[in-house]
């Protein structure tokens, strides 16, 4: 996406879309990782976790796992920073938390969590739709008038992006993010 569409969206949405595009094109992976403080990742995820319809046990699992992280790193470019938190201790609720955050708006472009404990993840179309609608609201991309649900993901022709949610109980994984 070289040029953003000519629609009535605010500067924060444009900033967020530029960061999302950088992340989705793979250019955000061109820098080296550096160890970062867990507080930085928690701060970046705070609004996101509050906005999404996670069960309270999921929010607690994320925060508990981040606070007890074995390793946390960040890498990124001018617009996007990707945080990864690993827990080697399988007693922790989450084994891995990954979040790509657009720097200017501090909005999450993509998020995934892999649980190491027996947390039940409800996987239904209505649950996925709830996550997608909350994400569009949270990211303020709900201002784009053409988001259409195609049976598995939302798609905006205006910006050429999909919004996908995976709730995988078998692999104990939750993923939410924009995709090409």
Predicted regions and their residues:
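Serine/threonine-rich low-complexity intrinsically disordered regions
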Residues: 10-12, 17, 32, 37, ...
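Generic detector of low-complexity/intrinsically disordered segments
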Residues: 19, 26, 57, 68, ...
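Exposed beta-strand-loop-beta-strand "reactive/processing" segments of non-cytosolic proteins
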Residues: 57-102, 148-180
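Long, charged/polar, surface-exposed segments that mediate recognition or autoinhibition
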Residues: 35, 86-148
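Short, flexible coil/linker elements and helix-boundary hinge sites characteristic
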Residues: 25, 53, 104, 136-140, ...
């Amino acid at each position: 996406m070289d040029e953003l569409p000519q629609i009535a969206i605010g500067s924060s949405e444009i900033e967020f879309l530029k960061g999302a595009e950088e992340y989705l094109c793979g250019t955000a992976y061109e820098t080296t990782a550096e160890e970062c403080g867990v507080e930085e990742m928690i701060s970046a995820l705070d609004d996101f976790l509050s906005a999404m319809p996670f069960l309270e046990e999921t929010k607690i699992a994320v925060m508990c796992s981040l606070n007890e992280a074995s390793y946390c790193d960040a890498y990124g470019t001018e617009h996007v920073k990707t945080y990864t938190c690993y827990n080697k201790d399988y007693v922790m609720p989450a084994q891995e938390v990954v979040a790509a955050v657009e720097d200017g708006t501090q909005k999450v472009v993509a998020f995934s969590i892999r649980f190491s404990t027996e947390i039940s993840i409800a996987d239904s179309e209505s649950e996925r739709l709830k996550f997608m609608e909350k994400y569009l609201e949270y990211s303020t991309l709900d201002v784009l008038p053409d988001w259409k649900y195609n049976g598995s993901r939302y798609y905006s022709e205006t910006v050429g992006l999909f919004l996908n949610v995976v709730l995988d109980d078998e692999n104990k994984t939750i993923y939410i993010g924009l995709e090409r």
